[in-house]
UniProtKB/Swiss-Prot annotation:
Residues 31-50 have a biased composition (Polar residues). Residues 235-300 are annotated as: Sufficient for strong transactivation activity. Transcription regulator involved in inner cell mass and embryonic stem (ES) cells proliferation and self-renewal. Imposes pluripotency on ES cells and prevents their differentiation towards extraembryonic endoderm and trophectoderm lineages. Blocks bone morphogenetic protein-induced mesoderm differentiation of ES cells by physically interacting with SMAD1 and interfering with the recruitment of coactivators to the active SMAD transcriptional complexes. Acts as a transcriptional activator and repressor. One of its GO terms (molecular function) is chromatin binding. One of its GO terms (biological process) is negative regulation of cell fate commitment. It is found in: Nucleus. This is Homeobox protein NANOG. The gene is NANOG. Sequence repeats lie at residues 190-194, 195-199, 200-204, 205-209, 210-214, 215-219, 220-224, 225-229, 230-234.
Amino acid sequence: MSVGPACPQSLLGPEASNSRESSPMPEESYVSLQTSSADTLDTDTVSPLPSSMDLLIQDSPDSSTSPRVKPLSPSVEESTEKEETVPVKKQKIRTVFSQTQLCVLNDRFQRQKYLSLQQMQELSNILNLSYKQVKTWFQNQRMKCKKWQKNNWPRNSNGMPQGPAMAEYPGFYSYHQGCLVNSPGNLPMWGNQTWNNPTWSNQSWNSQSWSNHSWNSQAWCPQAWNNQPWNNQFNNYMEEFLQPGIQLQQNSPVCDLEATLGTAGENYNVIQQTVKYFNSQQQITDLFPNYPLNIQPEDL
């Protein structure tokens, strides 16, 4: 009987048993290994994540197949609303002045182109207008006056204004001249107003030609006029001229008498006009002794 070969078998028996016992793997570990290997395979085969451009290309639809409307921004919406609601301009209310109001306003403008606040208020109360209406009317009238003076100013060859200004702005004379500006009980007189018109302030009323004139002269006295010798001559001439008519009146029938009286009346009117003419001539000679009375049209 051989012991040698049996020993190694006995010795190797537990090791072999142990190896045999350890070789078969349990099911749980085998499943875990399979899942881990599958995960590794999946990570290897999965493609990389797409970039942002790829996402945009994929998400952007085709305009021909499915068009998409973009929402409007709030600023664009406000602009469209403003365009739809166009503001309507308010029409200016035109003041219709009466003829009397226009006459008073133009008369005051000719005298004084710039009024103070108190003067405008007084004028508006008189004309039953508002202060703004009077102020606006004066402003418009001043603009018209300046424009008229600019267009009518005398100019030289170079187009520059020269010489004094033209006459006053004729805006007042374009209105009706027959309106009663200072009618009693209607509107107050402007005589008490102090006007700053240079034509009145610069006038020399105390001239020698006026102050040295003797107004109490016999030339202006009625008695002196009646006592003039030429007056008696005209009276005698009138009596001599009417004397034949009086004689015909006594020796003529009624129809001839009427004709004679008509002729005498016409002659009397002619004589009266002649007397008035000579009276005026005598007044001229008394006032202006050196004034030539027999002026012919060729001498002018």
